[in-house]
């Protein structure tokens, strides 16, 4: 399954997008400076329920400023070992403290990495406000990372998905 909503987290605010056949439709945005952030997010959540009564399940879009993007020349058969070697030492965090995705395109290895703690904070925020987060992604400029980096499932995803469902990534 692909999540029917995306919660776009930025340093200025939160946007909720609904998946439509042609891509994504903006449901609404809330400023982080909103007088009553919780109430404003509640309105977004209720609007989502009216738009799509099948249930709200979101992918969390992590701000690009929280992601380390690396591009390195590589051989055509690069794999996990090359990704970890390229990441090692580029952040103050241990490799096991990072979630990352990578793609190989034309001999160039594109890597996107984010601190797991950041993902946990985003998940907790979305859970507190009832947005049912199932996965983590980013939406960088295509020169940084071709496609949509996928940082995996949320810790709560198994509770939000049907037993037979898996989350499919957008490419």
Describe the residue ranges of each PLM region.
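Hydrophobic/aromatic-enriched cytosolic interaction surfaces used to assemble or bind macromolecules
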Residues: 1-171
């Amino acid at each position: 399954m692909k999540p029917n909503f995306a919660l776009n987290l930025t340093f200025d605010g939160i946007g909720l997008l609904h998946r439509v056949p042609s891509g994504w439709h903006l449901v609404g945005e809330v400023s982080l400076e909103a007088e009553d952030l919780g109430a404003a997010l509640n309105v977004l959540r209720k609007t989502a329920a009216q738009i799509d009564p099948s249930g709200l399940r979101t992918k969390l879009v992590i701000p690009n400023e929280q992601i380390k993007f690396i591009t390195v020349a590589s051989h055509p058969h690069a794999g996990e070992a090359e990704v970890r070697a390229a990441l090692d030492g580029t952040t103050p965090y241990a490799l096991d403290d990072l979630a990352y995705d990578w793609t190989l395109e034309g001999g160039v290895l594109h890597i996107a990495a984010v601190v797991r703690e950041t993902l946990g904070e985003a998940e907790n925020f979305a859970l507190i406000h009832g947005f049912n987060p199932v996965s983590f992604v980013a939406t960088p400029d295509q020169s940084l990372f071709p496609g949509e980096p996928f940082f995996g499932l949320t810790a709560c995803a198994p509770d939000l998905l049907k037993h037979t469902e898996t989350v499919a990534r957008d490419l």
